[in-house]
Design a protein with these regions (language model features):
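Sec/Tat signal peptide C-region and signal peptidase I cleavage site
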Residues: 19-23
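Disulfide-stabilized cysteine-rich extracellular repeat microdomains
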Residues: 69, 124, 135, 166, ...
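Short loop/beta submotifs within extracellular cysteine-rich repeat domains
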Residues: 153-154, 187-188, 386, 410-411, ...
Length: 705
């Protein structure tokens, strides 16, 4: 996307010319969308939607967030490895579809393990990711990561939490601070079985805390609550929470309702139960950690599915659905029509038309097989009823997630670690509003298109000028909170309709006047035509300091066809060289013999398997390339007919892990990097240690020829 300045020109009656700067528009990139091309559209897509083919994904994305630039960050496992470890961030650019250049991975982006953490955006534009941990790292569940979306870098230079926050929920409150709720010590999933012992051992965190960059984390000692965050029914486990129109925080923990005031030391109010307790066997209420919920309109929440307190509890799932209205002094609770399918560990998304799409889940606990639920269901607030939509191909249960993309489609990924499946894949659900019926078949609907905004940085109660590429009959202008989703709860989504007027191709809308309705952060702005078809969404900031970052971080570049040597940054005077076809590091300098100099010289070639990456051809053994083979690295003669050879001989340049030079990630084995160990060059999976960072960082220097 880009901006330019338009000049307003006026001629006065006597011929004088005045020129004034009227506005600096934010121009919207309406280039083709690869996610909308080449679709095999079924005949009923206009009524049931459709799913994409299953696409590969580099890791198990049990956490997903839409960044301000429109890219999607996922994390939860290492690359290609089905273990619990939140130290690898993957950045996917939807504008590139699913081709080989669409993903950019930050392995061990920081010395914090964000597995089963919580995340929200700060007013600075950075995403705060706090709590979590896994057995793979043993890192503290009191730690935080600050992810800068303008540079796609992460750091752990954030004050530590006061309490362990594994499985906590974090939201942004109206003044821009980050509020952490619930959570516990890692892996105390059975806390509900002996609440007294869990409390005695300080296993669960019953006091909220709040973060500001200037002060760090502060406990809200006046809001300690066993009712809201205690071990009973695992109420500490990812509480569902939202800022209410009153400015207080409303929450659902298992079957309990509560309200929190974050002023001063905080204060909490118990609002009672709205259903029976989860997992009692005689009924299947839509409560507990295994349920899902979304704010589909200001102060209105849809709570669906569940009936379990933990992923290991063998309980029948609920199909019940409840609307909770928190616009008054007391919540109003009423059941709406049940879903067709009972579900635990489903995901819910509010879409631009104001409906709610529920996907995934199981009819019993986290079972796949015959219990897996593949069809999506769509709930209409206008009718209070559900429509069964198209079927997915992959079971998405515990540790799966969904996210609304700017183009109005829904990304569905993850599931596993643990579970009956480990899903290194993703699917895209295309809701019915993206299609129209034509001659007995479904085709992509013509969509309104936003040409420009007066700014992508908006304040409260301000006018938003939206210009369309062509005039259209419009029904709505809406804002939807950019997603941050994990464990069946999207903590940042909310839906607001904006008042607007239309004159030709110009729409004048007004942003929310209250921070309570739309806390500071990032929102997708859509316009809907009279047929209910949305434009592509435009990401804007509201009450935030953010300005648009680049979509992709700068990739380190090498000069193709240059003669170079690879110099390990932590062994000055050493170069990578081949000896008897084995890649080693050795002391090589201008005074070394000619053979040593030639053995350490390589020609940079365009990657044999990926033009965005590189291959290294030996100078004195033409046709031989550095190639990985079962962790060993050496010279192998090129085999043009062997795709596996090309992948194993291709390395993608990354910023040096220790901050210096380059690191080289295998194209064939994502997450594995060239590293020297005991003077031998190897390909190893990044383990997060400072030594690995040093051993895998190289300077690229001119060859000594």
């Amino acid at each position: 996307m880009k901006t330019h300045c338009r000049l307003s020109v006026a001629f006065l009656a006597w011929g004088a010319l005045t020129v004034s700067v009227a506005h600096a528009d934010y121009l919207v990139d309406n280039a083709g969308d690869p996610l909308m091309t080449g679709l095999s559209i079924p005949a009923d897509a206009a009524t049931r939607g459709m799913w994409s083919a299953v696409k590969p994904w580099p890791l198990i994305g049990l956490h997903a967030a839409l960044m301000p630039s429109g890219v999607v960050m996922t994390f939860g496992s290492p690359l290609g490895n089905g273990v619990q470890d939140g130290r690898t961030f993957d950045i996917w650019d939807p504008a590139k579809g699913f081709d080989g250049t669409a993903h950019y991975t930050l392995p061990q982006a920081q010395q914090v393990d964000a597995f089963c953490s919580a995340g929200t955006f700060l007013k600075t534009g950075a995403m705060l990711i706090s709590g979590g941990s896994s057995g793979a790292s043993g890192y503290s569940s009191n730690a935080s990561t600050l992810f800068d979306p303008s540079t796609h870098t992460a750091s752990n230079a954030v004050a530590a939490l006061n309490l362990p926050r594994w499985y906590g929920t974090m939201i942004t409150v109206p003044d821009g601070r980050a509020l952490m709720l619930g959570g516990a010590k890692p892996y105390v999933v059975d806390a509900y079985k002996d609440p007294a012992a869990a409390i005695a051992n300080n296993n669960v965190s019953m006091t909220p805390e709040i973060f500001a960059p200037e002060t760090g984390w502060t406990l809200l000692s006046g809001a300690t609550s066993r009712t809201a965050f205690g071990p009973d029914d695992n109420r500490w486990w990812y509480p569902h929470a939202w800022v209410a129109p009153s400015g207080s925080v409303f929450g659902i923990s298992a079957n309990r309702l509560w309200s929190l005031d974050v002023a001063g030391n905080g204060a909490i109010r118990d609002l009672g139960t709205f259903k029976g307790a989860p997992g009692n066997g005689s009924t299947t209420p839509n409560v507990g950690a295994t349920s899902t919920a979304v704010m589909y309109a200001p102060g209105k929440i849809l709570q669906v599915g569940g009936n379990g307190v933990a992923n290991q509890q063998p309980t029948a799932s609920s199909n019940q659905a409840t609307v909770i209205d928190i616009n008054g002094t007391q919540p109003s609770v009423r059941d709406t029509a049940p879903m067709t399918y009972p579900r635990q560990w489903a995901s819910s998304i509010v879409t631009p038309d104001g409906k709610v799409v529920v996907t995934g889940g199981s009819k019993f606990a986290d079972d796949a097989g015959t219990s897996a639920v593949y069809p999506a269901e769509i709930w209409s607030p206008a009718t209070g009823r559900w429509t069964v939509a198209a079927k997915a191909a992959v079971y998405r249960g515990y540790h799966s997630t969904t996210l609304l993309l700017p183009d109005g489609a829904i990304l569905s990924t993850g599931g596993g670690v643990p579970g009956p499946v480990n899903n290194f894949n993703a699917e895209v659900f295309y809701p019915p509003y993206l299609f129209q019926s034509s001659g007995g078949r479904s085709v992509l609907a013509a969509r309104p298109a936003i040409y420009s905004l007066n700014s992508n940085k908006q304040d409260y109660g301000a006018g938003i000028t939206i210009r369309l590429t062509r005039s259209a009959s419009l029904s709505k202008v809406v804002l939807i909170g950019a997603s941050s989703s994990t464990h069946s709860f999207n903590s940042t989504q909310r839906y607001l309709e904006l008042p607007f007027t239309v004159s030709g191709t110009t729409i004048t809308a007004r942003s929310p006047s209250s921070r309570n309705l739309a806390p500071p952060g990032y929102y997708l702005l859509y316009v809907m035509d009279a047929k209910g078809v949305p434009s592509r969404g435009v990401l804007i900031s509201l009450g935030s300091e953010w300005t648009a970052p680049p979509v992709q971080p700068a990739q380190p570049k090498l000069t193709v066809d240059a003669s170079v040597s690879l110099a390990p940054v932590n062994f000055p005077g050493y170069l990578v060289r081949h000896k008897n076809y084995v890649a080693t590091i050795d002391q090589v300098s201008q005074t070394s013999d000619a053979l040593a100099k030639l053995d350490s010289a390589f020609t940079v070639r365009t990657g044999l398997a990926d033009a965005a990456c590189y291959s290294f051809e030996s100078r004195n053994f033409p046709g031989y390339f550095l190639k990985a083979d079962n962790g060993a690295v050496g010279l192998k003669i090129r085999n043009n007919a062997d795709a596996a050879y090309a992948g194993a001989a291709t390395f993608c340049a990354r910023k040096g892990m220790n901050g210096t030079g380059y690191s080289f990630e295998s194209r064939a084995y994502p997450g594995q990097f060239l590293r020297h160990q005991n003077y031998v060059l190897q390909l190893q999976t990044f383990d997060g240690t400072p030594l690995f960072k040093d051993d895998s960082s190289f300077s690229v220097v001119p060859a000594l020829l």
